[in-house]
Regions:
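Catalytic cores of alpha/beta
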Residues: 78-93, 137-148, 184-188, 192-200, ...
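Conserved, mostly hydrophobic/aromatic
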Residues: 22, 48, 87, 145, ...
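Active-site mouth loops of central-metabolism enzymes
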Residues: 17-32, 131-135, 192-197, 209-215
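Glycine-rich phosphate-binding active-site loops on the catalytic face of alpha/beta enzymes
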Residues: 99-106, 154-166, 194, 213-240
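N-terminal active-site wall of soluble small-molecule enzyme domains
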Residues: 47-111, 124
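N-terminal amphipathic alpha-helix/helix-capping segment at the start of soluble metabolic enzymes
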Residues: 1-35, 111
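Glycine/Thr-rich beta-alpha phosphate-binding loop at enzyme active sites
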Residues: 90, 94-99, 104, 133-180, ...
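Alpha-helix-loop-beta-strand connector modules within alpha/beta enzyme cores
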Residues: 63-79, 108-109, 125-137, 168-191
Length: 240
């Protein structure tokens, strides 16, 4: 992972691919969900994590099929979230699993490492997943995740965020400790917002026009200075 890449490449609204992961939450969108995701794809983040884990599995399967196709159109990686059976059904070897789910599935793997793969049976691992993300909240979590075969992780929450009201952020020292403890890419999550050219954050209110705004990610430099590969954005991406 080249952590020296710049966030921008010629355009203020072309996010450098290695730096930003977009996290979805359809409940935050003012536009139709697929329309909003197309706007996100036009920013060319490193990946979009389809984190609609409150959906029934059949509904998620249908949505995932459409989102994977949309992401392919824009050459953006789509990471499915939690629904491991959906990933297998769609033969889509890119998934983000909460750490307890990752650990549970690894226990079914005789070799003890999910990245050695799975066939279409969740009990039979045979070279299936190419990218496995997980979420960590301590250095111990991070070390465990790497041992379990995660290929990247999100760590947080780093800054104060409405998504975690009442919970103090873990801060930049925590992020640096996580980054120092593992070899795989770490993406900071929590309180990382998009700033538009009028100095407001995209998470404050949805854009009221169809044109893509000029944007920046003010806190990205801070997290990358701690050794992170980049940052994750939910609210801002669902309202850009």
């Amino acid at each position: 992972m080249n952590k020296e890449k710049l966030l921008y490449e010629n355009s203020k609204h072309a996010l450098q691919s290695d730096n930003i992961i977009a996290i979805t939450n359809r409940h935050l969108c003012s536009r139709p969900f697929m329309e909003q995701l197309e706007r996100v794809c036009k920013l060319h983040p490193h990946a979009i994590v389809l984190r609609e884990k409150d959906m029934p599995e059949a509904e998620y399967l249908s949505l995932a099929r459409d989102v994977i196709a949309l992401c392919k159109k824009y050459d953006v990686q789509c990471m499915l979230h939690s629904f491991i059976n959906v990933a297998m059904e769609l033969e889509h070897p890119y998934i983000h699993l909460p750490l307890p789910i990752l650990e549970a599935y690894v226990k079914k793997n005789v070799s003890g490492n999910i990245s050695t793969g799975m066939s279409k049976s969740t009990d039979n691992y045979q070279q299936f997943f190419k990218v496995i993300g997980t979420s960590v909240h301590s250095v111990e979590d991070a070390i465990k995740a790497e041992q379990l075969g995660a290929t990247y992780m999100t760590a947080g929450h780093i800054f104060a965020t409405d998504c975690k009201k009442g919970l103090p952020p873990r801060g930049l020292d925590f992020l640096k400790n996580v980054c120092d403890a593992v070899e795989i890419p770490v993406y900071a999550i929590g309180g990382i917002n998009i700033a538009s050219n009028d100095n407001s954050t995209a998470s404050d209110s949805p854009s009221t026009y169809d044109a893509m705004p000029d944007i920046s990610v003010p806190r990205l430099a801070e997290v990358m200075e701690c050794g992170a590969a980049g940052g994750c954005i939910m609210s801002g991406m669902m309202r850009v």
